[in-house]
């Protein structure tokens, strides 16, 4: 069930933000951990500069027999990540990157979600180097693009750490 469909569990009251309405629907569906799980997903989107996490690009699992809500579906559709449509020279950790679904910029969405994220950030140590190696081996990039993406990912990891402190 997409998040857009899930958010129809109850009507959105006037003056209630989409973020608060989403959390109200999670509570109504008995999914108390969903806020944390969505924040973790959006944190990954921030680090990878995913620009297309709209309400149709994540969702929830239900038991097909009992219709009980089971939780957040695994992450899917991250195809507009890693500065995919950005010229190499413009790739930067602090560049303005649009966000969805709860804010319009990734910086403002990061401020919204940071208090709820519980990712073990120490597991990201060395991630940007591994990403660089994978991109250099697998992709048909121009010279320096993999290194530029890796540096930007590392910068975003560091900015995320600062926002969590």
Predicted feature residues:
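Anionic ligand-binding catalytic core segments
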Residues: 1-50, 54-55, 59-165
């Amino acid at each position: 069930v997409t998040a857009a469909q899930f958010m129809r569990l109850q009507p959105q009251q006037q003056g209630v933000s989409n973020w608060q309405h989403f959390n109200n629907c999670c509570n109504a569906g008995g999914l108390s951990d969903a806020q944390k799980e969505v924040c973790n997903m959006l944190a990954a989107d921030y680090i990878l500069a995913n620009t297309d996490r709209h309400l149709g690009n994540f969702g929830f699992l239900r038991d097909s027999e009992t219709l009980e809500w089971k939780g957040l579906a695994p992450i899917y559709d991250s195809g507009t990540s890693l500065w995919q449509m950005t010229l190499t020279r413009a790739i930067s950790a602090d560049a303005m990157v649009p966000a969805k679904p709860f804010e319009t910029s990734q910086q403002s969405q990061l401020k919204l979600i940071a208090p709820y994220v519980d990712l073990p950030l120490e597991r990201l140590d060395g991630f940007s180097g591994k990403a660089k190696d994978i991109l250099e081996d697998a992709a048909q990039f121009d010279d320096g693009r993999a290194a530029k993406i890796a540096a930007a990912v590392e910068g975003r990891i560091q900015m995320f750490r600062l926002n969590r402190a």
